[in-house]
C-alpha cells in the first residue's frame, strides 16, 4: 500500500468515525467500520477472482446479467469455483461497489435505500458458505452489525443516510 493510499484510508476512517461519534461508543462503531471494511475486502476479492475466470471470455463480472440463461450459467460456474477457492460467494449485484453506487444514486425514480439489501447480502455471504470447509470461518461474521439499531438513526431513512 502506497503512502497516498494509507493517507486516504486514514482520512476515510476518521470521516467515518466522526460521522458515528456521538451516536454510539467507540467499541460499537468499531464493529460497523470493521464489518464494512471486511465486506468491501470480500467483495473486491470476489470481483478480482471472477474477472480472472472470465478474462478468456472477455467479460467483466459486474456486466453479467443474472436474469438471462447465459448469465445464470456463468454465475453458477463462478459460484462453484469461488466456493472451492475463496470459501464464499457474492453475486455481481452484491458487490460493495454496486451497493455503494445504489446508495449514492441521485437518479430520479431509483431508490438509494440500501439497508435491506445490505442485511440480505451480509446474510448471503454467510449462507453461501454452508456445507463448505469455510462455514465455521464465516459463522456469525457480521452479527455485530445491527443495521436496524436506533443508534445509527431514529428512522430507517436516517440509518440509511449514515450507512
Regions found by a protein language model. Give the residues of each.
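Non-catalytic, mostly N-terminal accessory regions of nucleic-acid modification and defense proteins
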Residues: 1-163
